[in-house]
Amino acid sequence: MRETPSVRSARDSWGITESVGATALGVAAARAAETAQADPLIRDEFAFLLVSAAGPTWAQMAVSDPHWLGADADARRIHEISRNYQAVRTHYFDEYFSDVAHAGIRQVVILAAGLDSRAFRLDWPAGTTVFEIDQPKVLEYKTATLDAHGAVAKARYVPVPADLRDDWPAALVEAGFDPAQPTAWLAEGLLPYLPADAQDRLFELVGVNSAPGSRIAVEAFNMSPERYTEERRAQRRARGEQMRKQLDLDIDVDALMYTADDRADAAQWLSEHGWQVEAVPSADEMARLGRPAAEADLAEFGMDGVLMRARLDGERL
């Protein structure tokens, strides 16, 4: 097995401005910036407050115009591609939840939820429970921030502090999850931050805890070592240097990811384990929603992934 090193350790943990936690701030900032556009693809009225509560450095990332990039046209182009990608990804999974709600599923589990605000911003049918699993400090930050601003969930909202590398199903059941009921699962922006064997174990545990008719939506990427060589990582770090200097941040997202040439293809794994999968390349979904981007640009910045949804019992999605 070939792999490129990660700065992560087997038992690492983090708060919202640290390590993987900081990536949740970056994603929420992109949603806030999209929401502030004249014709936004998605609206997340909670994104800005969740980002700005982390401090002014983060808040300036969450506005419509990336003024902090100055006149650097290339940096602005990259920023726009990233914002568009995050908007399209969010839209795809919002549609997924709308579909599963109409299908009658009333139990939702968001894995590594970060600063996801769907429990508060989507219109859930009566009787829906949204469970969110993430690191304790991340969930503490989110719930405290939302409570301080009087945010009211539109479903029964249950944060579950747990590490996805531990026995998280036990924590989920203890919080009220019923594995006998169909569940809608979400793994968005998660898989690159799991070792290959942990990804397999995650899917196995999801399957064990999924009743017939359950659904799952996943964002997957090509995490082979060839894509994340030290040379390519250095090139990507150099491209993002102005952003880090302007924002006074020292975060190397690539170094937080796990790469290995034996990582299972998510769609193939799910198909082989009884799930009926429908998948779309991110470039195709971006084009469909009017936010096209060159595939070479998406590949260079790790956004040439696959968005997929699957149903356990093999019926049409």
UniProtKB/Swiss-Prot annotation:
InterPro entries: Ppm1/Ppm2/Tcmp (IPR007213), SAM-dependent_MTases_sf (IPR029063), SAM_mthyl_Trfase_ML2640-like (IPR011610). Pfam families: LCM. The keyword Amino-acid biosynthesis does not apply. Its EC number is 2.1.1.-. It comes from the Bacteria. One of its GO terms (biological process) is methylation. Keywords: Methyltransferase, S-adenosyl-L-methionine, Transferase. SUPFAM superfamilies: S-adenosyl-L-methionine-dependent methyltransferases. Disulfide bonds: none annotated. The keyword Lyase does not apply. GO terms for molecular function: methyltransferase activity. S-adenosyl-L-methionine binds at D134, D163, L164. Exhibits S-adenosyl-L-methionine-dependent methyltransferase activity. Belongs to the UPF0677 family. This is Putative S-adenosyl-L-methionine-dependent methyltransferase MSMEG_0093.
